[in-house]
Swiss-Prot record:
Binding site for substrate: R91
One GO CC term on file: cytoplasm
Protein family (similarity comment): Belongs to the acetokinase family.
NCBIfam families, sorted: ackA
Gene it is expressed from: ackA
Species annotation: Geobacter metallireducens (strain ATCC 53774 / DSM 7210 / GS-15)
Pathway: Metabolic intermediate biosynthesis; acetyl-CoA biosynthesis; acetyl-CoA from acetate: step 1/2
UniProt keyword Aminoacyl-tRNA synthetase present: no
Protein name: Acetate kinase
Amino acid sequence: MVILALNCGSSSVKYQLFDWEKKEVVAKGMVERVIIGDSFIMHEVPGRETYRKEYECPDHKVAIDLIIRTLVDGEHGVLKDINEISAVGHRVVHGGEMFTRSVLIDEKVLDAVKDVQHLAPLHNPPNIAGIEAAQAVLPSVPHVAIFDTAFHQTMPEHAYLYPLPYEWYEKYGVRRYGFHGTSHLFVSKRAAVLLGKKPSDCNIITMHIGNGVSHCAIRGGVSIDTSMGLTPLEGAVMGTRCGDIDPAIPAFMMQKENLSAKEIDSILNKKSGVLGVTGRFTDRRDVIENANNGDHRCKVALEIEAYRLKKYIGTYMAVLGRLDAVVFTAGVGEMGWPIREKTIEGLEGIGIKLDRERNKSAMTRKRETLITTDDSPIKVFVIPTDEELVFTEDVVAILDGTYTDHMNFDYSFARQDFVRS
């Protein structure tokens, strides 16, 4: 069984082809600059040089068609025929309250995803476009939706409701939903393995730190709180998003700068966070380099980010009552050792003892690493995430009828004998 996993953004399509019988990734890549022009595909096959080709993709259908043609290409492909693809798994950012698990996509499901796209206007429309495009290119295979929000549907009411007029929740669904669910699921299961415990016996804080950043408090394998909210704007400091701020600031600045609601929303989502403070950078490597060279705004940006991360550890530790481990994952979480160090240092009093040398050596996207001392009561791990593997396993389980939900399903990566492909 060969599964194609697709992750469609507003101007990109990421893909991964997984051979389930061999338990290995046979190809992966990305089409970038979809719609906006000068688009190209980067195609990777293990053991070969990365293949790049410029090809104009005015929409997602053309991009997905390009991916399929590349996968079956005589020189660069890995398939002899398009019919070797057994099913397609699609990342869908927002599933509202309706979807608590991954589901087979039919007309009713697609309509429901469209009904909640107002809750994620930057994310769901390209997800929907990708589903429709893939169905057009691969009409005879099953398509499955895997929702970012599903993992967090276990949050209690007191965690997901905002102290706002209750009618807003009833009429418009205004509540905390949370995102990056598949990433939090994967790394929390792996952390339980590294702890030598069952997920049901673990209390874990997972920290997904990339351009987007979210944290999750996980008790007994279940999400009980998360930092992102109604939208991915809430929570920690991010590459271009502000995260938690005084909610009066937008109205204040709209008056001062004569900004529209659309303009202030764009600023908070695209011109704030690390970019807003530094004025130049979203890539933390650039921020770290310039901070080390004396750039005050870059130094402050790092301090703000690490300070907010530290606060979330304390907050979620209080919520959980007992903590077994903290996990760093995603691009910055996996590679940004200075940010991890700034976040963890000073937490010895609550049982987290950083091993600085281990932390500095944990700079790989392949290895799971303990970065606290052996005698640290609370462990801190760096665990590379693998959302596409979650997509793949959900698809396979739905097709063979063994899938229940993310809490009870026996994922391969939750086993002691799991080996990364």
